[in-house]
Amino acid sequence: MPKRILQGKVVSDKNEQTVTVLVERRFKHPLLHKTVRSSKKYRAHDADNQFKVGDTVRIVECAPISKTKRWTVLTETAEVSA
């Protein structure tokens, strides 16, 4: 089974070797047909403590590292400003 890759923004880097990433998804409401935004926070492993608050990163699913960490930071993505 392939590993999931998500993209989100770092909202906390206070813990050692851990960042909290806010991932937002958009979907169409089945009844109202309106675009709805939903967000979820994931705790990801950052071995070198290189990512700071506000960075946009990609995280990949991995084996459990601790009680709450099941994701690892893959890379930092450059935001495209339109």
From Swiss-Prot:
CDD domains: Ribosomal_uS17. Keywords: Ribonucleoprotein, Ribosomal protein, RNA-binding, rRNA-binding. It holds the Pfam family Ribosomal_S17. The keyword Ribosomal protein applies. One of its GO terms (molecular function) is structural constituent of ribosome. The keyword Signal does not apply. GO terms for biological process: translation. GO terms for cellular component: cytosolic small ribosomal subunit. HAMAP family: Ribosomal_uS17_B. Part of the 30S ribosomal subunit. One of the primary rRNA binding proteins, it binds specifically to the 5'-end of 16S ribosomal RNA. Belongs to the universal ribosomal protein uS17 family. This is Small ribosomal subunit protein uS17. It comes from Paracoccus denitrificans (strain Pd 1222). The gene is rpsQ.
